A protein has these predicted regions:
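Small beta-barrel nucleic-acid-binding modules, primarily SNase/OB-fold domains
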Residues: 1-136
Length: 136
């Protein structure tokens, strides 16, 4: 695995070790962009959690940017996306007026003021992208 952001990793399938790694976008979370405050912390946290570890990747399709969409689970079954939100490294955004899949983890992290939830100026990535565009 290789991490390129707080919600994006490159994974290599076990069944095809010679194949190129696949870019995976974690479903259900949105981490700060690399160029925005908290972006480096989110990327480092995800790296520390998954780098050089065997992971399970249930996929859900491909997004408009060509990234595979899916979950990311460690060998012990723990959900990496849930952990990222619970530790205050990512948001679980609402979708079509429905709560995000990790709403409970986000509420708890906010209540405990963990990570980016301790910063009253922390800006959700979708608002950052709307205001500033993507990182170069």
């Amino acid at each position: 695995t290789r991490v390129s952001g707080g919600d994006t990793v490159w994974v290599r399938p076990d069944d095809a070790p010679r194949r190129k790694p696949v870019k995976l976008r974690l479903v259900g979370i949105d981490a700060p962009e690399r160029c925005q405050p908290w972006g480096a912390e989110a990327t480092a946290a995800l790296s520390e959690r998954v780098l050089h570890r065997r992971v399970e990747v249930p996929t859900q399709g491909v997004d408009a940017h060509g990234r595979v969409l899916g979950g990311l689970f460690l060998a012990d079954g723990s959900d990496v996306a849930a952990w990222m939100v619970a530790q205050g490294h990512a948001w679980s955004p609402r979708w079509q007026h429905r709560p995000g899949p990790y709403e409970r983890e986000q509420r708890e992290a906010q209540a405990r003021r963990l990570g980016l939830f301790a910063d009253p100026a922390a800006l959700e990535p979708w608002r950052f992208r709307r205001a500033h565009g993507p990182c170069e």
